[in-house]
């Protein structure tokens, strides 16, 4: 007869671990857990400790988003999450470059002379955008832990900032910060200790292009104000870039992992563009329609590509 402690531990395993892993390791894990838990009161009233629960949840993340030694669909899901994280790094690099240039505390005064006006909000915004850039660079240069810490701190700061808003601004704030939260979650879930660092050379080039493109357009917007073209291209750079990448992926009949990663990002970026469309920003309605069509097509292609038998592979 099972003790209450064993039942509670098995319940923890059911919640935290995928079925394929439990089928292979559950009995072994239960035996090891109960080996030194022999006290009758403990068996009747005891619970798995916080340390055990935390370790089990961490194992669950590593096995649900595995890089090897798991069913094919599980490995593919892990690859999708890691791709979402890397695309998110490019997105945050572009947003960071835009933010650093657009949030510089300057105003035009006395003709072309720039006069600095520093305030706490501007300082926090500037530091946050610099941290976003540093986190993106850290990730593509192999400093995964640094990147995860920086993006985690940014997510917390932005969450506090949204919590201070009221009314419709809360919803808009949530939509604006969704990309950084998605990036952080994907980094933490996908790049766990068992996941190898992928080849980063092409991602370094991609980040350089992302930062330089966003920076050039934003600088043009600042210097050429009030010309609308610069503002429009700067605002739409990230979703247009992801959209073009998605179209190219479909045209080349790329794999399901790439399709799901790009499709997911089109879904994440779509709500903010819908807000722009509500304010009748030029070209945004057409962009929203294209993002919706291409995003759905990518997700359908990706999900179809993952429909294959899942075979457990024990290392």
Which positions does each model-derived feature cover?
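Short, well-ordered alpha-helical segments
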Residues: 27-29
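P-loop NTPase catalytic cores that bind/hydrolyze ATP
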Residues: 24
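Short, charge-enriched, intrinsically disordered boundary segments that mark the beginning
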Residues: 1-12
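Cytosolic juxtamembrane regions of integral membrane proteins
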Residues: 31, 35-107
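Hydrophobic alpha-helical bundles in membrane proteins
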Residues: 74-315
């Amino acid at each position: 007869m099972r003790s209450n402690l064993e039942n509670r531990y098995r319940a923890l395993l059911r919640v935290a671990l995928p079925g394929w892993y439990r089928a292979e390791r559950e009995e072994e894990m239960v035996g090891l857990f109960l080996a030194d838990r022999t006290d009758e009161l403990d068996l009747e009233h005891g619970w798995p400790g916080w340390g055990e629960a935390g370790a089990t949840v961490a194992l669950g993340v590593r096995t649900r988003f595995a890089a090897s030694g798991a069913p094919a669909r599980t490995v593919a899901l892990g690859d999708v999450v890691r791709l979402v994280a890397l695309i998110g790094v490019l997105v945050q690099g572009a947003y960071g470059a835009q933010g650093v240039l657009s949030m510089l505390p300057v105003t035009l005064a006395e003709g072309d002379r720039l006069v600095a006006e520093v305030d706490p909000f501007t300082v926090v915004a500037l530091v946050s955008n610099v941290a976003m850039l540093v986190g993106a660079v850290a990730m593509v240069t192999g400093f995964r832990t640094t990147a995860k810490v920086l993006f985690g701190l940014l997510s917390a700061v932005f969450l506090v900032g949204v919590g201070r808003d009221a009314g419709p601004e809360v919803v808009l704030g949530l939509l604006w910060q969704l990309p950084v939260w998605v990036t952080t979650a994907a980094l933490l879930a996908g790049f766990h200790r068992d996941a190898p660092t992928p080849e980063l050379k092409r991602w370094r080039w991609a980040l350089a292009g992302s930062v330089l493109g966003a920076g050039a357009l934003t600088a043009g917007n600042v210097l050429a104000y009030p010309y609308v073209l610069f503002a429009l291209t700067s605002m739409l750079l990230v979703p247009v870039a992801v959209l073009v990448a998605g179209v190219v992926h479909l045209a080349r009949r790329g794999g399901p992992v790439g399709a799901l990663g790009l499709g997911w990002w089109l879904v994440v970026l779509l709500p903010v563009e819908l807000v722009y469309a509500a304010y009748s920003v030029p070209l945004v309605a057409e962009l929203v329609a294209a993002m919706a069509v291409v995003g759905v097509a990518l997700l359908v292609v990706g999900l179809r590509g993952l429909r294959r038998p899942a075979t457990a592979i024990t290392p």
